[in-house]
Amino acid sequence: VGALSVLLDMEYEIFEELISEQFASKKNLIEPNLKALNIGRDYVLNNLPYPIGLTLERMEKNDGKILISGNEAAGLGAVYGGATICAWYPITPSTSLAEGFEKYAKKFRVDEKTGKNLYASVQAEDELSAIGMAIGANWNGARSFTATSGPGISLMSEFLGLAYFAEVPVVVFDVQRGGPSTGMPTKTQQSDILACAYASHGDTKHVMLLPEDPKECFEFSAMAFDLADRLQTPVFVVTDLDMGMNDWVVDELEWDDSRKFDRGKVLDFEALEKMEEKFGRYHDVDGDGICSVSYTHLTLPTSRSV
C-alpha cells in the first residue's frame, strides 16, 4: 500500500488517517502498520521511477450519488411504471430483478387498510409459462412483465410472436450473459441484441430500450410499460450481467409525481357508447397502425404515482 501510494501519486496523509481509524481500538497496531507503510513508500522513492502515469485523486464527488445495481433499479422502475404482475423463472443474471420488484412491491403495492397485496410475483415452472402468464395478464388489462436472459429469450420466442401479432403489450427484461446455449451464466456479454430485435419467426421487429447505467435502468423500465401500452407490442429492456448484478455509483433516481401512466388507446364504456360504428379490435380507425382496445370489463391500474 505504501508503494502504491507513491506509484499512483496518492495523498500519503490519507493512508495515515485510515490506519489510525482502522486500528483505533487497538492502539498497539497503529505504529507497526505505519512503519510498514513507510517501508513500502521509501523503497519506491529510492529505487523506482514514479509516478507511473496513473493518478488516483481524492474523491469528493459523492454528493447526489447513490449505490445501486441495474436489476434493483429496474425492479423499482417497474413498480413506478405501474407493473402489478411479475411472472418469471430463475436464471442468472436476471433473478435479482424479479426479486427487486417484489421487494419494492411489498412497500408500494400493498393496501394500507386491508394489508392485501395489490401485486403478484409468480415463479413459474419454466420460461414458457413465465412469458405466457405475462402476456395473459397484459391481455387482461394488467401491466405485467418477465425477466430472463439469453436462453430464456430463445424459449420465449414463439410466445413473443403471438404477443406481437395479437398486439398484446408485454415488457421483457433481458439481462444478457455470455455464450450461446446455456453459455456462461456468470460472465457478461452483449450478444442478444439481434435475438431480441427479431425474436420469434416471421416478420417481427421489436421495440428495444438499452440503458447505459442503473439510473437509466430505472427510467427505461418505467418508460417500457407506457411504450408497450401505447404501441400494443412487446418492449424489451436489454441490459447485461455487469450492469444488472453489480452496484454502480449513479445520480439519485428522480421521478415526477405528476406523471400519469399512458395506457394508450383504451376505450371505456362512455367512449364505446359514443362510437358511430361497431367496435372492431383490429380496426385501424386513426390510420396510424395502432388500433383501439377495450378493457371495459376490467379494473385498470391507477394512474396516480406511487
Please tell me what each predicted stretch does.
Residues 1-21:
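Short alpha-helices
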Residues 7-9, 27, 95-96, 179-181, ...:
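Short, well-ordered, mixed-charge alpha-helical segments that flank or form enzyme active sites
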Residues 10, 34-46, 206-262:
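Structural signature of the thiamine diphosphate
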Residues 14-199, 205-206, 211:
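Thiamine diphosphate
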Residues 245, 249, 256-263, 268-289:
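Active-site loops and adjacent core secondary-structure elements that bind or stabilize anionic groups
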Residues 292-294:
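Acidic, proline/serine/threonine- and glycine-rich low-complexity intrinsically disordered segments
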Residues 296-302:
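Conserved small/polar residues in nucleotide/adenosyl-binding loops
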